[in-house]
Amino acid sequence: MKIQLFAMAATVMALIACNSNREMTPQEGYIGPSDIQITDGHMSPEVLLSLGRVSDPQLSPDAKTILYGVSYTSIQENRSVRNLFTIPVEGGDPVQLTMDGKSISAARWSPDGEVIYFLQGGQLYKAPYREGRLGAREQLTDIPSGVEDYALSPDASQLMYVTSVHSAVEVPSDSDPMLDKAQAYATEDLMYRHWDHWMTEIPHTYVAALGNGIIKEGVDILGGPEFLYQLPNGPFPDIADLAWSPDGRYIAYACKKLEGKEYAFSTNTCIYIYCPLTGETTQVTFEGGYDTHPVWSPDGSRLAWLSMERDGYEADKVRLMVGDVHYDAVPEGQAAGPMVDNIRDLTAAFKYNADGPVWAEDGKSLYFAALAEGVEGIFNVVPEQEPVIVRLTADNLWFDFGSPFGVLQDGTLLTTFTSMDFPTELVAVNDNAIRQITYENQHILDQLDKHETEARWLKTVDGQEMLTWVLFPPKFDPAKTYPAIEICLGGPQGTLSQGWSYRWNYLMMCHQGYVVVLPNRRGTTAFGQPWCEQISGDYVGLNMQDYLTAARNIKAEPYVSGVAACGASYGGFSVYYLAGIHKDVYDCFIAHAGIFNEEHMYMTTEEMWFPNWDNGGLHEYAYEEGETGPGGDGITFGGIKQGGSPWSNLPKAKRHYDNSPHKLVRNWNTPILCMHGGMDFRVPVDEGMAAFNAAQMMGVPSKLIVFPGENHWILKPQNALYWHRSYFDWLDRWMKD
């Protein structure tokens, strides 16, 4: 591996990424940008982990400066640290504001742009901002359970913050304080663990006044810790699910006010409006699936949000809804507060999923992002009764654009963009003209050899067209032969677009000498809802044929010597299933966090709504409390409609479980690597161990790698490095001469 790493003294580090001669003193534990030197022109795991990660841009009130964060990683220290930067909207050199040894997050401008608020170490701070410098910091909160996220009211006189409260899951010290060293979890209901943690605590959001000394306690929006709902919703609580009204009198929020089994099987998340002054709450939406991300129009006369229609189906079309807000009319039987009516779907005639709605400054239209035909673009819609949606980024631009974080007076959109060739950067877009603002990793990416990417539309077995990206190694020569990697997408709903990943990094794969094949098979979300929905109840059907179509297409090329199939989560399921049916199509397999035994998976995963729908139930949530045993209809058990369960009598569910990958192990004969995180509660680690054990019992060359402290993803730097090295070691062993 031809890479040189140069260690730089702190005095030199202090000058990196700054646009002036000001010297800053790095704090203990500070990690700065990498000066990695690449001598062979190839992206490698070490190069990947050296990249700075740009995130959370915020436009200043005068629309002249962007505040953002960059995380840098130390493999040796096995950690990353995030610090703050600014850059002019017009571009130029960034200014580094902090050089801390502990990460800083959620930086926000004050309304006058003279103060910057931020989180560090679980508490909120502020510091004056003058002439490109941060002044002395002042601590604003001292919350015992810490502040996880926050949002200031428009005039910065009030604060809402997210912290943790005790859940229904019991620990020994709840009944006896003397047992404070005992470790056990007790529950009498579902949803006792989520993603990677036992649910001993859940998020609640509080409101407090700013400016009266250090905040030690606020008012719980939900009414108190005895209300065991999550606000924001887990497992990744996001303050974007709460929004201050422009006058600071109200907070719109999204919440799934359910617990236990009901929480586990339902996606019914509703929009509410809370009044901090009176403590009263008005419910805006009542039924259906996820309602999230409320945003007020600038004058407060309208409220927009994202919505799914069907309860229990997390891959339903994401609609952009808007309603008119009335402050002088309250429905009978509801608490005093504004009423929202004339609710309409602005995207009814739009075939894609809306994301990240942002109001235009004049309140006459909304911007949003959407994955459309394999790339993510920015769109605009005027909220009239017959809305017209206009795409603002050209569909032939091979980038993924995020939703705008700022709109300038001339209509220029400030946003983020990525591609398979570079990670997140800040960019300005106007009439399809793109002006890149940040170049965080240009000094590293410029050292890499160039490669080519091709978009192929392949004919599927049922005569449809499937977008398949193909990446070729640098200096590709069609007269030579190369091994190929087919990526099996997780989800199963998602899209192989022009996004950037720090694990499934396609640029690195092609730089390691592989042709990389990315089929947007049935179930992907950027090609309309029918293409997405087809996969539900048909995991072993058309999408598997789509994989085989793409594999055979690339294998027929004279420059391809063999094909490996690799994937995570549902992609791991795909690998395990393909291993039992492919015959001689594939030469090697890698599965990370894959589903192996669908019956076991149904009874050990946490978010039950997903398998209950996708495994063949295809029905909305229904529950009758107090019922036990079979309901007599073949799909209701314990009062819960469970058409996607192993005990369902629905034909699609029966077919699903009859074709679980573990039942096809007798056909396995191809080398397989199984990797899994020990803290993965979405697809428990037993799935990976069972697949490996089965491969061993069949005499199939196989390897198991378990990361005890990792979840569904591999996040710690040294673990990530080992994961990548193991990935390529296995591929090279079986795919290269």
Q: Which ranges hold each PLM region?
A:
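Short glycine/acidic-enriched loop and turn motifs that connect beta-strands
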Residues: Y72-Q76, H166-V169, L258-K261, E309-Y313, ...
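Predominantly five- to eight-bladed beta-propeller fold
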Residues: M24-I31, D35, V81-R82, S164-G224, ...
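Short loop/turn segments that connect beta-strands within beta-propeller blades
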Residues: P88-G92, P128-R133, L210-G213, C275-G279, ...
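C-terminal motif of bacterial Sec signal peptides marking the signal peptidase cleavage site
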Residues: I16-A17
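Cap/lid segment of the alpha/beta-hydrolase catalytic domain
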Residues: E440-G562, A568-S569, M603
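Active-site-proximal cap/loop segments of hydrolase catalytic domains
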Residues: C510, L518-D737
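Conserved beta-propeller blade repeats
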Residues: L51-I66, G101-I116, P144-L159, Y192-T205, ...
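Non-catalytic accessory segments flanking enzyme active sites
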Residues: D56-Q58, M160-V162, Y185-A186, M191-L210, ...
